[in-house]
Amino acid sequence: MESYKPVWLKGAVILAINLIDKGYKPVAVGLGERDFYIDVKSDTSITLDEVKKAINENVLANVPIENNQIVYKGNKVSIIEDKVSISTNLNPKYFEILNISTHHPNPNEQYVRIRGVAFETEEQLKDYLTWLEKAEETDHRLIGEKLDLFSFHEEAGSGLVLFHPKGQTIRNELIAFMREINDSMGYQEVYTSHVFKTDIWKISGHYTLYRDKLIVFNMEGDEYGVKPMNCPAHILIYKSKPRTYRDLPIRFSEFGHVYRWEKKGELYGLLRVRGFVQDDGHIFLREDQLMEEIKMLISKTVEVWHKFGFKDDDIKPYLSTRPDESIGSDELWEKATNALISALQESGLKFGIKEKEGAFYGPKIDFEIRDSLGRWWQLSTIQVDFNLPERFKLEYIDKDGIKKRPVMVHRAIYGSIDRFVAILLEHFKGKLPTWLSSVQVRVLPITDEVNEYAEKVLNDMRKRRIRAEIDYAGETLSKRIKNAYDQGVPYILIVGKKEASEGTVTVRARGNIEVRNVKFEKFLELLITEIAQRDVEQTTVKALK
């Protein structure tokens, strides 16, 4: 998606100017996850045909941009995008308007929102529309509703998700897996508040350089902020007592809730929200420990993505360098950047460069993952930071008794757990691996006469912490099987009189695979192993065939 965004933004600007020429009043253009949007004042009606006519109008070769606004014929149109710039080299000619709807940025305002895409060639447009049709079939928002995983409610607030029991089960499994990964690397888990005085954001630099994302309020004469990041809190834990060179590295982890005020037009299901949980981690270490730590993080990150079935070709690291707005000296930035480059080179991974896309306090390695639809998602990050230890005056006593500054490394493997849930739902098309599925087995008694045996099978699985449920014979067997498939249940156990008398089950798995006369204890043993190993494939049914 990211590679399309520059041409989409240019297309949105072109269309906005053409709409002005037609007498309409666009007020903003921006980018969504899969398209561009234009907000138009709704004091005059606008139809799809009128928008299509405006597409073909001539447009100025060089669009006048001032202070991130299109300035044209007395109109000022805000550009709601700070990561993609307007390119004079792009010339989109092929447009598709995806929909026109009413948009309410607040209760007192109403706009017409036009969503569309633009490309330089007709072939690119056709290919994208074909891909989009497939993507819409696996939209995580539809899957989430269908499987009863999560919901959004305007009365609760835009971009604030409510996870239902089945959705929370998936999150819990992801967190449990990451806890094991963290334990294997020597992390100590911490918990920090959701709200802090803004003093720490002023020290860290977030208050100035991250101000548009901060949610702040005043209480009893003090200014507080809902945390957008966990790092300053972890720094304060480090500072809570003296540290020596023998203590380092110190590794803190937290499944921390953070909140960032994303623009309403950019919110998109779980992929772009205002409140989410990070699998965050911060390491405080000596400079001589830095290289090995980064190499370990790179290795563990790749190991995690392999566990979810992503191959080496689906994993692409990038080095993101110093942005225009940053803190710290050139010397510190160069030192941090060189450390990341050296670790990447020693890892043997091929990596790209993203100029000026580092964090404001340090360079970083970002990992992008390619899903089953060919999309690349930025997930994991490893950031080297010499600046925040300096700003917070962090210290440790070296072996020679001298106080020195530690280096700080920020890291997250999933990134946002909520966003990762969305990516997994779309990647697996709602059919999650057994260990992640909110319901792992559904028992289907053929008739009420075998309910007692079906319930014994159910209870035996639940005693072994398998997430199982039963669907009694209220509907036909074929209908109940279809319901289980549609709801992404990995395994279906069918039991009738024969199975009840022999202590067996008929096992059905995804792909319409069926295995009869399976001893229930044998199935249970194999399933426990599949779940414990967190297999991506359904290894239980493979072993039974």
Swiss-Prot record:
Zn(2+) binds at C231, H282, H410. Its EC number is 6.1.1.3. Residues 139-433 are annotated as: Catalytic. SUPFAM superfamilies: Class II aaRS ABD-related, Class II aaRS and biotin synthetases, ThrRS/AlaRS common domain. One of its GO terms (molecular function) is ATP binding. Keywords: Aminoacyl-tRNA synthetase, ATP-binding, Cytoplasm, Ligase, Metal-binding, Nucleotide-binding, Protein biosynthesis, RNA-binding, tRNA-binding, Zinc. Catalyzes the attachment of threonine to tRNA(Thr) in a two-step reaction: L-threonine is first activated by ATP to form Thr-AMP and then transferred to the acceptor end of tRNA(Thr). Also activates L-serine and transfers it to tRNA(Thr) but cannot deacylate incorrectly charged amino acid; unlike most archaea the editing function is found in a freestanding protein. This is Threonine--tRNA ligase catalytic subunit. It comes from Saccharolobus islandicus (strain M.16.4 / Kamchatka #3). The lineage of its organism: Archaea, Thermoproteota, Thermoprotei, Sulfolobales, Sulfolobaceae. The gene is thrS-cat.
